[in-house]
A protein has these predicted regions:
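Glycine-rich phosphate/adenosyl-contacting loop at the front of the ribokinase-like
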Residues: 1-66, 77, 319
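Conserved post-catalytic alpha-helical subdomain immediately downstream of the catalytic base
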Residues: 218-222, 227-229, 246-319
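Gly/Ala-rich phosphate-binding loop of Rossmann-like dinucleotide-binding domains
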Residues: 59, 163, 270
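Short, basic and Ser/Thr-rich N-terminal targeting/leader segments
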Residues: 48, 61, 98-100, 228
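Short pre-catalytic strand/loop immediately N-terminal to key active-site residues, enriched for Gly-Thr
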Residues: 37-46, 244-256
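Ribokinase/PfkB-type carbohydrate-kinase core domain
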Residues: 1-20, 43, 80-98, 105-242, ...
Length: 319
């Protein structure tokens, strides 16, 4: 089995829930005088981060993630947990001069979110392309790579390294669309086989770069825009396919569903499935994560996932 190179944030998530509506609370507020406070009776602290969320969900599917990231002084226990889960920490840098990145995410009763992200140690990290710990040692095992949101300098180093190594790249800029320059965004898209973002992020990415779907597809093989409970739009040179979402039994918190989708997508890409089936598995994985409080499933019933895909789409996936 080939490996998937994953670079993204390694973080702790603080999840807060607001029983009202952010939209209602902000009605009539003058933005230049904005001062609001939300009472949150629900508090949870979880292991999170885009990189680790994707890696763990991929591992549950039976994939072999190669995780690259940075943790801080409080990251030792997180690394120990990853090792217990069978995820190598060989390329996780541990800094002694900062804390691990932390995300604080508030969700209202309509699943709207307000988030703050402190990069912590990730802002001080480095890309392991030289020295005693060198990604070149594992290059031959890597089939695909995903570059997700983290320190923008390291994102660009990752994109360039993957390009120099001829590694198939999935570009996932996420919240860092506004942290990368227009030239960096355009060059990253040009060097990628696939681009993925949610509907809101695609609007910003398109506006900033001036690129429409057809422009992305001049160089990339596909563009995936996730649409929440409406499913996924898969854009290829053949056209656009709307793939419905998989229904969850219950929605506890939507945080992490996108990362779970990416894990399913990458699992399929490594298996050389067609893009539609990759997205279907991603949708099934996302539906599992929204049923829990947190972004990383404790366990996964693979037969249940395959059955959910079959029931939703009428298609058996290869195992």
């Amino acid at each position: 089995m080939s490996r998937i190179l994953i670079t993204g944030s390694i973080a702790y998530d603080v999840l807060l829930s607001y029983d009202g509506s952010f939209a209602d609370a902000l009605k009539g507020q003058a933005l230049d005088q904005l001062s609001v406070s939300f009472f949150s009776p629900h508090f949870r602290r979880h292991h999170g981060g885009t990189g680790t969320n994707i890696a763990w969900n991929l591992r549950l599917l039976g994939g072999d993630p190669l995780l690259v990231g940075t943790v801080g002084t409080d990251g030792g226990s997180y690394c120990a947990l990853l090792e217990e889960r069978g995820i190598s920490t060989k390329y996780i840098e541990q800094r002694k001069d900062s804390v691990t990145a932390t995300a604080i995410i508030g969700t209202d009763n309509g699943e709207r979110q307000v988030a703050f992200f402190h990069p912590g140690a990730d802002a001080l990290g480095s890309w392991p392309a030289s020295g005693n710990v060198n990604l070149q040692d594992d290059r031959e095992d890597v089939a695909w790579a995903v570059v997700g949101p983290r320190n923008p300098v390291l994102m660009m180093e990752a994109v360039r390294w993957c390009g120099s190594q001829g590694i198939s790249l999935l570009f996932d800029p996420g919240q860092l669309i506004i942290g990368l320059s227009v030239d960096e965004l355009r060059s990253s898209i040009t060097m990628s086989r696939g681009v993925i973002c949610n509907e809101y992020e695609w609007g910003i990415l398109s506006e900033r770069t001036g690129m429409q779907t057809k422009d992305v597809l001049k160089t990339a093989e596909f563009l995936i825009v996730t649409l929440g409970d409406k499913g996924v739009a898969l854009h290829t040179k053949k056209g656009t396919e709307e793939i419905p979402a998989c229904s969850a039994d219950t929605v506890v918190n939507p945080t992490g569903a996108g990362d779970a989708f990416r894990a399913g997508l990458l699992f399929g890409l490594e298996k050389k499935w067609d893009r539609t089936d990759c997205c279907r598995l991603g949708a099934a994985m996302g539906s599992k994560v929204v049923e829990i409080e947190g972004t990383q499933l404790d366990s996964l019933d693979l037969e249940e996932v395959w059955e959910q895909v079959r029931m939703t789409y009428g298609k058996e996936l290869s195992k």
